[in-house]
């Protein structure tokens, strides 16, 4: 085997064929980083048949003018069960970056550490404990099992729905009551989904602004989303949920006709048997449903007059690769949250994964705190409702390449942090 530079074609073909291949280890991300002006490297291992058996996208950033900080975002893509290959790769990678004036190397592999439920209870070990000792022996320092959302470090916990050998009906059956109701609600209430073009991205951004204001979280800027849509191409999808009022009002009218028919039947039952409590209760329940139905029809007609026949209500931003569909971000119009548009977006993309033979639907990051007062408690509850599981990853590893200078660099950084 040999450590070597890879072409974009070689890199892309290999990473597309592997499990635990993150969207930041794709040709789209490589082209994005080139366009942003980063120094980038595609490296990997080839076997004796000249076949790629490991690959990694690296970016390099200047440090202290003379040196560089090398980072592989969720890399490398490699068969982690082959410990000999892992050892060879990281050993050769260290030699490679040293030749390019590397001060230190930072990696955060897409490698599971353990599995949990959404209450934070450990349900299984991923069998990768050996990796920590291996990296230590290779000169890497583990930065710890951090929790929460960090502006620099990748999130260590993902909420993931396993789709392997499942049907859409299986997914619905495994949801909790609220998720089932809202998924069925959007299916019958005229909520449609289509995909936004680059020119329509401001619709998504407006929803993100609404959501970030109501939930008090910091969103990425416009450039982040536009650039990824541009360079990832078909590997990014932005589904939009919208109300088609013609269909919505038609369905409500059909529902009203059925309710009126049932109500008349209940009234006749009461005439025949005035003492029948069940008939009285049924009448009251049907009348409540009719009142709610009339309110929805009136609201639908009013909104149709104000906004036209189609009203955007929610949108999401998704990364796609053969390994997984990733729900990266999403937002909903605060004024029309009651239409449950986010459920239509999720259901559309779950079915996209099922229809394209993608076995993993990644709801993406959670803090890992699993408490009622955690900043993402509501999000965790939402994801839990789909019967997803939590995957905790091994975390971040740093290897000083030039040890004397790195020691001086970290000491200076600590002093600056104290001052500022």
Curated annotation (Swiss-Prot):
Listed EC numbers: 2.3.2.17
Database matches in SUPFAM superfamilies: Acyl-CoA N-acyltransferases (Nat) (SSF55729), tRNA-binding arm (SSF46589)
A Pfam family reported for this protein in Swiss-Prot or TrEMBL: FemAB
Principal location class: cytoplasm
Keywords, comma-separated and alphabetical: Acyltransferase, Antibiotic resistance, Cell shape, Cell wall biogenesis/degradation, Cytoplasm, Peptidoglycan synthesis, Transferase
Keyword Acyltransferase among UniProt keywords: yes
Subunit structure as annotated in this protein's UniProt entry: Homodimer. Interacts with FemB.
Similarity section: Belongs to the FemABX family.
Name of this protein: Aminoacyltransferase FemA
Organism of provenance: Staphylococcus aureus (strain MRSA252)
């Amino acid at each position: 085997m040999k450590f070597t530079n890879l072409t974009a074609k070689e890199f892309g073909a290999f990473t597309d064929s592997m499990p635990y291949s993150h969207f930041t280890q794709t040709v789209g991300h490589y082209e994005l980083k080139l366009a942003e002006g980063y120094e980038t490297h595609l490296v990997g291992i080839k076997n004796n048949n000249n076949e790629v058996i490991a690959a990694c996208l690296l970016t390099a950033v200047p440090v202290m003018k003379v040196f560089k900080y090398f980072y592989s975002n969720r890399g490398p893509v490699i068969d982690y069960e082959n410990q000999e290959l892992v050892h060879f790769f990281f050993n050769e990678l260290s030699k490679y970056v040293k030749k390019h004036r590397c001060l230190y190397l930072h990696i955060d592999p897409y490698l599971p550490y353990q599995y949990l439920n959404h209450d934070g209870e450990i349900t299984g070990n991923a069998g990768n404990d050996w990796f920590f000792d291996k990296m230590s022996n290779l000169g890497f320092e583990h930065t710890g099992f951090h929790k929460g959302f960090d502006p620099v470090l990748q999130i260590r916990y993902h909420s993931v729905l396993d789709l392997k050998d499942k049907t859409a009906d299986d997914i619905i059956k495994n949801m909790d009551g609220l998720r089932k109701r809202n998924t069925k609600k959007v299916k019958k209430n005229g909520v449609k989904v289509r995909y936004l073009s680059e020119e329509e991205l401001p619709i998504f951004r407006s929803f993100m602004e609404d959501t970030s204001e109501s939930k008090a979280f910091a969103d990425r800027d416009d450039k982040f989303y536009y650039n990824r849509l541009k360079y990832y191409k078909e590997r990014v999808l932005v589904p939009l949920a919208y109300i088609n009022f013609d269909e919505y009002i038609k369905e409500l009218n059909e529902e009203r006709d059925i309710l009126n028919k049932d109500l008349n039947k209940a009234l006749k039952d009461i005439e025949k048997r005035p003492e029948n409590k069940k008939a009285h209760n049924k009448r009251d329940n049907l009348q409540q449903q009719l009142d709610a139905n009339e309110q929805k029809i009136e609201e639908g007609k009013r909104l149709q007059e104000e906004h036209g026949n189609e009203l955007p209500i929610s949108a999401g931003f998704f990364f796609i690769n053969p390994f997984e569909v990733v729900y990266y971000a999403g937002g909903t119009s605060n004024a029309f949250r009651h239409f449950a548009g986010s459920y239509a977006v999720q259901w559309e993309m779950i079915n996209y994964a099922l229809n394209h033979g993608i076995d993993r639907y990644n709801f993406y990051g959670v803090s890992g705190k699993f408490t009622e007062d955690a900043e993402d408690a509501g999000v965790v509850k939402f994801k839990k409702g789909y019967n997803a599981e939590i995957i905790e990853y091994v975390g971040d590893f740093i290897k000083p390449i030039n040890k004397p200078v790195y020691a001086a660099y970290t000491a200076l950084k600590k002093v600056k942090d104290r001052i500022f």
